[in-house]
Amino acid sequence: TPGRLADILLVEDLREMKPSQVYFEGRLVAKDCKLIQTCEVGEYPEWLKNTVKLKQLITEKSFRVPARTDRPQTQVTVIDLIDRQIINKRLIATLPCVNGEILADPVHDILKLAIVERYGKTGGVGVGFVRGFGLREGAMAYSMSHDHHNIVVVGVNELDMAQSVKVIQEMQGGLCV
């Protein structure tokens, strides 16, 4: 746009994506893969730094999925990830139920997935199940989902999920593994 400063990456071959020139705020800062000028980034305004305002304390209980049966197992709908695809499949899986709660099944790569509202408006936590992450222990959480920028957390158990969300809150956003 005329009159605006741009960040541009020029490549000669889209298959290699090797930059020949890099422009930062309209200035040439790298040429032929060599930095020729530093890229000073200014301070972020305060309103960008404090955006994780959880309305309620997130604990293990926040990620519990109640079982609607007294049986030791139940069928649930699972998001079945397709490697390197944005479109996924729907899977019906049988998961264990213990003490009135549906549990994840990490042995079969079925984990809990949750979205935690981060702006202090509703305090909502939506929990489901996902297969295909390959996570065998622990949890990961991040706050940079392009659709909504709430906190997304996936984990083998609820305690690790809650701890990951706590770290995201303490960092005021980011990625926690």
Functional labels for PLM-detected ranges:
Residues 1-177:
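Active-site microenvironment of metallo-dependent hydrolases
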